[in-house]
């Protein structure tokens, strides 16, 4: 099963993915993959890191000072996706019960290897929970095992409960 979480910027996609990760780990499931938290400097968003959930390794994904392909005001470090994110996701495919990818968006998709790896995950049998940029969602092929949830501040708790119920049915967790 693939659970894709989308919504407007600031709607709580990453928070939702984090809550679901905590829930699964609390149930004894192993979780791997990546998160891409923002980096703030002086109260302003300066960039984004990519963090390997299993090892804790981190690298700078994008910043206002990074050279590389641009997404808005951020330069993207494609190399960190290829060298840190892709191996983390591939390792999680082999070793973990669930893969987390936060997020599948324009910055991350600048890496051809990342795009290939996401396609592999989508074609695999492993459980995936991913935050997906709204515009990216259309490019992800529709599959029977993909469930899309739209998060907004008013419905966050209801959406979370619907996903927990779905996970319980899927994995017999209840």
Please tell me what each predicted stretch does.
Residues 5:
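Hydrophobic anchor at the beta1->P-loop junction of P-loop NTPases
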Residues 9:
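The conserved Walker
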Residues 16, 20:
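Hydrophobic positions on the alpha1 helix immediately C-terminal to the Walker A/P-loop
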